[in-house]
UniProtKB/Swiss-Prot annotation:
It comes from Carboxydothermus hydrogenoformans (strain ATCC BAA-161 / DSM 6008 / Z-2901). InterPro entries: DNA_mismatch_repair_MutS (IPR005748), DNA_mismatch_repair_MutS-lik_N (IPR007695), DNA_mismatch_repair_MutS/MSH (IPR017261), DNA_mismatch_repair_MutS_C (IPR000432), DNA_mismatch_repair_MutS_clamp (IPR007861), DNA_mismatch_repair_MutS_core (IPR007696), DNA_mismatch_repair_MutS_N (IPR016151), DNA_mismatch_repair_MutS_sf (IPR036187). GO terms for cellular component: cytosol. This is DNA mismatch repair protein MutS. SMART domains: MUTSac, MUTSd. Pfam families: MutS_I, MutS_II, MutS_III, MutS_IV, MutS_V. Belongs to the DNA mismatch repair MutS family. PROSITE patterns: DNA_MISMATCH_REPAIR_2 (PS00486).
Length: 841
């Protein structure tokens, strides 16, 4: 048995879009068949049925109503599927045989432009990767905003590129099937598309650059052209950027510092507390800038100048915020314009946004000569009054969403529209009068003239009045409680009314397309305006945060220094309240004070102190004021952190292995301009190993890297490194003791401590009283018996006495080239040395 003609048509189309779930239009539904139906039924939680298709068995089928398909499509996209929409492209009434169908739209996670499928405040990236001549290139696009960027790195710096991919968090990626560095794809949560080979079609390359960059660009553009043919109109020249031209921090640092989100909710993050943006464009800009702070002194100073003007001018700031509040997302609207998906309501959004641009331009006129950025914003705000006037005279103030539904063109814009509208309205008046006339003629007071899309106009008479129906009524449909009729006269006027309505809807759509084409000429102006608005909104958000939280303008310098007076952690301070937060000073350079070794109990504030230093640097380098009484920030090229210990057992990695991998990454990538934060290094292994590794890392940083470093530890023995290793300074967190009660003062001061207050912290954590009291008894017994480090055999070799000539295991340990070893080699070697050490006992 062969398939039915309709199913053959389906299978032919499905063959061309085998990587998509095919939504096949049948009447008022999109139907899915075979494996697509099984998947959609499972993912959308809809009923799986079957359909006769000319085979012995019914084929699996499920469907969704076409008018509510968006929600279902969005759900499938969020779960990593692609969807192809196959429409009926001819009127079924006029079709001879099988209705013609074809795919009119493809939706994929990384290429959607409709706001329904997008997060308003988040960019939606798609990337392509290529490798050639020792380089790996990345091409990245944001289709909904028209952004296109390209970067490349040496194959030896693959981890840097991996970090950039994590920063972008793409929802889709494209690579050739023979792409070797699959390590780069492991963190992509969306779809990864594998192409057999580079498309044969010629894609024009209008830029010079490495072959890897050109190949990545070709892969991306060829894929996008299949999804969205207007893609070349969306993008201009790609932006070439170097990852190392921004302050670098990897995914671990982003999570540790809670820059974009914390573990519980997004609001308790750095982004969450400083986001005072009024537009979607500004919100995306702020998020983007927080993940790529600047390294250019002048660019930072220009931002700080603009923020300072906004901080000091209340009237300017609040007027601009009010204007921004009434601006729509011009960036994404301009792309919908290019793609031809813009609707009448979108045009009204553009119209309503333009006067706000005029007000903004007028407001910043008096400050454009005081700031480079205000001058740039002013220059990039075209007024586009022609666009406003065209929309204002042509489109009604509250049009329907669909341009094909009619009711979008204003009266007086087009004479023919006015004529059709008059004919339709006169016809509708005739219907009202006809209903009145028929009630009088028949004596049926409940008689109604109604309309639906299936039967057109009809007369409805209840069962109780059927004996009064005249002979010229022709029965059309029998209902439970009524019957429907038509008359020759009603049919005649139906043709006139529906003819006028159809002609009117068609003409309105034609006029809408003409208006859209005219506005398309201003697409670049719209994009420029959107970019300027995003920058302005970003700067105002920084100014509002500065006022809200009492931030001050930092001094930015090229010197390798970090000096902070009464610095605060902005997120913690917001959580506990300004009055309850204890500010702290910090001074770091690369000479006398290059590594602060911080001791103190858990919960005393060591991690907060370290994190706030990094957050102050990030804020300063995006051009923001900072939470401190005074801050002098020497440009930092990388912030590298090891804070907290999170087991990665799912990947077969223990706490200690994760710790060593992260430390290895820091030591390999840090430079003298970096800021390093190391919290409790070595605690994932035995005391001997932990202290040895911690000291070796400190020595390496001080001798080889010379970076500004904050190093917290519970190994009090390490405090002896002050005076032995240049640049190491001891700092501790003040604690107040009163009997068995301990108060953490959260004040970081020069000095050291030899107490951990672990039992007290256990008490705070709610351990049973019996356990806590027993712990104090055992501690007292140890102390009474003299079981202290200074009275017994040392728990480690003294770090600071005259050292004997190394031999055996120690000599082997010293000779290890830790930086060149992989984490696995280091772990294996450590195990081997431990076995040898046990043998030497």
């Amino acid at each position: 048995m062969s398939f039915t003609p309709m199913m053959k048509q389906y299978l032919d189309i499905k063959k061309q879009y085998s990587d998509c779930l095919l939504f096949f239009r049948l009447g008022d539904f999109y139907e899915l068949f075979f494996e697509d139906a099984v998947i959609a039924s499972r993912e959308l939680e809809i009923v799986l049925t079957g359909r006769d298709a000319g085979q012995e068995e019914r084929v699996p089928m499920c469907g969704v109503p076409y008018h509510s398909a968006q929600g279902y499509i969005a759900k499938l996209l969020s779960r990593g599927y692609k969807v192809a929409i196959c429409e009926q492209v001819e009127d079924p009434k006029k079709a001879k045989g099988l209705v013609k169908r074809e795919v009119t739209k493809i939706y994929t996670p990384g290429t959607v432009t409709e706001e329904f499928f997008l997060q308003e405040k988040t960019n939606n990236y798609i990337i392509a990767l290529a490798e050639k001549d020792g380089l790996i290139a990345l091409a990245v696009a944001e289709v909904s905003t028209g952004y296109l960027g390209i970067t490349s790195v040496d194959e030896g710096k693959i981890e840097v590129l991996a970090s950039e991919i994590r920063r972008l968090a793409p929802t889709e990626a494209v690579v050739l099937k023979n792409f070797k560095n699959n390590f780069l794809l492991k963190d992509i949560t969306g779809i990864v598309n594998y192409l057999e080979k580079l498309p044969a079609e010629e894609i024009e390359i209008a830029f010079k650059g490495p072959e890897a960059s050109k190949e990545a660009y070709k892969i991306l553009i060829s894929y996008l052209k299949r999804i969205e043919p207007a893609v070349l109109s969306i993008f201009g020249q790609p932006e070439f950027y170097q990852i190392d031209s921004y302050l670098y921090f990897d995914e671990s640092t982003r999570k540790n510092l809670e820059i974009l989100r914390n573990r519980e909710d997004n609001s308790s993050s750095l982004l969450g507390i400083i986001d005072f943006t009024q537009t979607a464009m500004g919100a995306r800009k702020l998020k983007e800038e927080l993940t790529k702070p600047l390294l250019n002194l002048k660019a930072i100073a220009d931002r700080l100048d603009a923020v300072e003007i906004l901080v000091n001018d209340y009237e300017l700031r609040e007027n601009l915020r009010e204007n921004l509040k009434n601006l729509y997302d011009l960036e994404r609207l301009s792309i919908k314009l290019v793609c031809g998906t813009i609707n009448p309501k979108d045009l009204i959004k553009i119209k309503q946004s333009l006067p706000q641009i005029w007000h903004i331009k007028n407001s910043i006129n008096h400050v454009k000569n005081k700031s480079v950025l205000f001058a740039e914003i002013y220059k990039n705000l075209p007024e586009m009054r022609e666009v406003y006037n065209l929309i204002d005279k042509s489109i009604v103030d509250d049009p329907p969403v669909s341009p094909k539904d009619g009711g979008i063109i204003k009266n007086g814009y087009n004479p023919t529209v006015d004529e059709y509208r008059k004919a339709r309205e006169e016809g509708q008046d005739w219907i009202i009068n006809y209903e009145k006339k028929e009630r009088e003629r028949t004596g049926i007071k409940s008689l109604k003239v109604n309309y639906n899309k299936v039967f057109g106009y009809f007369i409805e008479v209840t069962k109780a009045n059927l004996h009064l129906v005249p002979a010229d009524y022709q029965r059309k449909q029998t209902m439970v409680n009524a019957e429907r009729f038509i008359t020759e006269e009603l049919k005649h006027y139906e043709n006139l009314i529906l003819g006028a309505s159809e002609k009117l809807a068609n003409l309105e759509y034609e006029l809408f397309c003409e208006i859209r084409s005219e506005i398309l000429k201003y697409q670049e102006d719209l994009k420029r305006a959107a970019s300027a608005v995003a920058l302005l909104d970003f700067l105002i958000s920084l100014a509002v945060a500065a006022i809200e939280y009492d931030f001050t303008r930092p001094v930015i310098t090229a010197e390798p220094v970090l000096e902070i007076k009464n610095g605060r952690h902005p997120v913690v301070e917001k959580s506990v309240g300004r009055a309850n937060f204890v500010p702290n000073d910090l001074y770091l350079d690369t000479k006398e004070n290059s590594l602060l070794l911080i001791t103190g109990p858990n919960m005393a504030g060591k991690s907060t102190y370290m994190r706030q230093a990094a957050l102050i640097v990030i804020l300063a380098q995006i051009g923001s004021f900072v939470p401190a009484e005074y801050a002098r920030v020497g440009l930092v090229d990388k912030i590298l952190t090891r804070i907290g210990a999170t087991d990665d057992l799912a990947k077969g990695q223990s706490t200690f292995m994760v710790e060593m991998i992260e430390c290895n990454n820091i030591l390999r990538n840090a430079t003298s301009r970096s800021l390093i934060l190391l919290d409790e290094v070595g605690r994932g292994t035995s005391t001997y190993d932990g202290i040895s590794i911690a000291e070796a890392i400190i020595e390496y940083i001080q001798k080889k890297i010379k970076a500004r470093t904050l190093f917290s530890t519970h190994y009090h023995e390490l405090t002896g490194l002050e005076g032995e290793i240049p640049g190491v300074k001891n700092f501790t967190v003040l604690v107040q003791e009163k009997g068995e009660e301990v108060k953490f003062l959260h004040k970081v001061v020069p000095g050291k401590t030899d107490k951990s207050y672990g039992i007290y912290v256990a008490k705070l954590a709610g351990l049973p009283r019996e356990v806590v009291e027993r712990a104090y008894e055992i501690l007292a017994r140890f102390e009474d018996k003299g079981l202290k480090v200074k009275d017994t055999v040392p728990v480690q070799l003294s770090l600071f006495e005259e050292k004997p000539e190394p031999s055996g295991v120690i000599k082997e340990l010293i000779e290890l080239d830790l930086i060149r070893m992989t984490p696995l080699e280091a772990l294996n070697k450590l195990y081997e040395l431990r076995q040898k050490a046990l043998g030497e006992k």
